[in-house]
């Protein structure tokens, strides 16, 4: 199994690479790519960790050598948020970066499963889909927006609030990956209940958690370490499913049946070809249903922005 990380010299990419070097199955290959000249050195640094995962680093304009033979590609390349910015302010820079990298994926490893971490995910996934479609290699079961950070934050915050072990809480999060489009389904956590006020406040905290980190870092960046952990969890789940493990379920932002929007984050059963089944979002509370209805315009606009970036 070969996993490529694009944007591997950045804060998320280095954290992700460290976790993958430690946790990928024995015999896996990990290839790191970034435009920054430090990238081969990051790979050498990680190569000293005694795990049976081969690692190589590549830098420069051309990601092709890193992508050859990749089964999974995780893209974290791009600029990070600064205080006062929201994820959509990143669009102008990051849209072009994602387009360029996905064009290289389309040529070099068109059958790979691709996880997009680069913000704004609501939009960059639509860009990636349109690029792959133009190249004639788009498979909607193999393109994912990585929203796992919303899930792990939800798990943490719920456990704190309710005095549970964080490892025992699993919150499904649906919708998109910014602001109001992030919808944790708090009503679906077994054995935990919330007052309406708790649910509203917790939902808001989960939606604004990225800003919490941006402000706490005081201009020094955005969520890199927790995002690295989230991306590693998703990437490792994908690898396990591709290798034939049964019953692997993760939420991610994918193209579905279009019931809510062209792309929508929902629980997915993963398998040997990527998405095996898009699972139902189940029964929502009145608060969740209202939040879902209220976000769809925003989500659809975000998606349209990505489609237009490629098609206009």
From Swiss-Prot:
Keywords: NAD, Oxidoreductase, Tricarboxylic acid cycle. NAD(+) binds at residues 7-13, 34, 94, 117-119, 227. Substrate binds at residues 81, 87, 119, 153. Its EC number is 1.1.1.37. The active site is at 177 (proton acceptor). It catalyses: (S)-malate + NAD(+) = oxaloacetate + NADH + H(+). InterPro entries: L-lactate/malate_DH, Lactate/malate_DH_C, Lactate/malate_DH_N, Lactate_DH/Glyco_Ohase_4_C, Malate_DH_AS, Malate_DH_type1, Malate_DH_type1_bac, NAD(P)-bd_dom_sf. GO terms for molecular function: L-malate dehydrogenase (NAD+) activity. One of its GO terms (cellular component) is cytoplasm. GO terms for biological process: malate metabolic process; tricarboxylic acid cycle. PROSITE patterns: MDH (PS00068). Homodimer. Belongs to the LDH/MDH superfamily. MDH type 1 family. Catalyzes the reversible oxidation of malate to oxaloacetate. This is Malate dehydrogenase. The lineage of its organism: Bacteria, Pseudomonadati, Pseudomonadota, Gammaproteobacteria, Enterobacterales.
